[in-house]
């Protein structure tokens, strides 16, 4: 028998106050004081945990009763979540804190289908919720021996800086109506639809730089709390794409920065990506890393990321300026940059997300936004279908979730066969939401080889070959998962011996020129590649931090790519391309044939194909 325990904190709700008040979010001109009433349902005789898996609070907003339903974000941290900081003498200190009973929740408002909530219950209720299409914030009032909270609209916060905030990614906007038309008519095969429907998981590392440490007066608890709140909101936003984000690591550069963090965002992103590839990945497994910095980037830029780079060792990264007192605004900037990593471009004027500003607008708006546009959805789907980033299909092991298992949190944990959320939210006919067990006569609930709750017939293609260097995978008939992506051996000749296979592709100079300059483009004469011997400007083979290194004569076709657009006349026109936001754009792809029996390796050297792999 379940006994309902009503814990009444206070039934009063005071009207809006006449004077302004200074809260954590800034100076608020119009607010309401409420005393939330907590309703707890526990079995008779049960011991109440510090932070329950589900909670319900009642209070009034604008004189109307509001019921806030909360459920703990159980997948917020991975089992091997770690925190790294540095001693005054520079020693790395890594700990694995126990965070099973954390206090971060997502939720909704009762009887409001479009509502959302992201709340920290660590010390009172702090966070934000969407009610009847409007964004409200809630936080405890710092009064002794009081449970009073302030509730206020985002629009009632005095803005310290009215300048528009920008994403530093350039040249990604829709150029005309035509791409939008194509995106809205995206047609997928049944195999591709199964892939799109499959849950995706991103294991995230966040790095706080030394300026952040100074900004928060070396208070690691304050930094940790801010980042946890951001990731909690990030999860809420990406649920629309069936993507679940687990924080696997937090690194705080407490002693000094480990890269040269500077106001030039493109340089900082390049340095951070290189550090991620050469340092972070070697001691911490993860899918994506974001740098949260206290420095002010040049102009109005508050974030930058590579586009279409998820799972790439260097480029699966982004940088975010800690530009706003509100956690939610920083989280939205992080969601925007992560969207670029997931292949999403900036929205054009004809992109729509229901009349509100959208996540992928090039200008970060003055109000919190949660929705991706129709353009973003189709752009993301196209990226997934074309690139199949492998790391986001790695389901966390059922033992990898930090918190004790709970049915209804969307993560399959010990003792569960499926988890489609709470019964009121579950839309999966294969799963019994009340027990987190598969329904009778069903074999699966999700996966590229799961169709109508049954394993797909053996031999059914679940991942098509993307090139002659790739291998198609087929369902086994014994599992809901598509077998591991495999491809032809590296170094195998391809495209009529014009190239050699490399990680499932056949990179050749001609196709790289066409991708940059159009179908009439061809590879430039050898004399153009002599620019790479100079080691100046954009013409080089290797780059380490701020230094660039010229190509050796035998390696010149492994540096900057040179092309000719259109027929070659009497005058040689050497064309190349580069990008401030991604310094690797315009370089010859790794694995490209640079001579008979020779390919470009990771050091941009032209080496024997038999020894390269």
Swiss-Prot record:
Active site: 337
Cross-referenced CDD domains: ZnMc_adamalysin_II_like
E.C. numbers: 3.4.24.-
GO biological process, one term: proteolysis
Binding site for Ca(2+) 2: 406, 409, 411, 413, 416, 419
GO molecular function: metal ion binding; metalloendopeptidase activity; toxin activity
Residue numbers covered by the propeptide annotation in the UniProt entry: 21-190
Source taxon at top rank: Eukaryota
Residues annotated to bind Ca(2+) 1: 203, 287, 391, 394
Localisation per UniProt entry: Secreted
Motif placement: D/ECD-tripeptide: 468-470
GO cellular component: extracellular region; plasma membrane
Residues at which Zn(2+) binds: 336, 340, 346
Keywords from the named record: Calcium, Cell adhesion impairing toxin, Disulfide bond, Glycoprotein, Hemostasis impairing toxin, Hydrolase, Metal-binding, Metalloprotease, Protease, Secreted, Signal, Toxin, Zinc, Zymogen
SUPFAM superfamilies the UniProt entry points to: Blood coagulation inhibitor (disintegrin) (SSF57552), Metalloproteases ('zincins'), catalytic domain (SSF55486)
Cofactor field: Zn(2+)
Tissue: Expressed by the venom gland.
Other known facts: The disintegrin domain belongs to the long disintegrin subfamily.
Subunit structure: Monomer.
Function: Snake venom metalloproteinase that impairs hemostasis in the envenomed animal.
Entry similarity comment: Belongs to the venom metalloproteinase (M12B) family. P-III subfamily. P-IIIa sub-subfamily.
Name under which the protein is recorded: Zinc metalloproteinase-disintegrin-like VMP-III
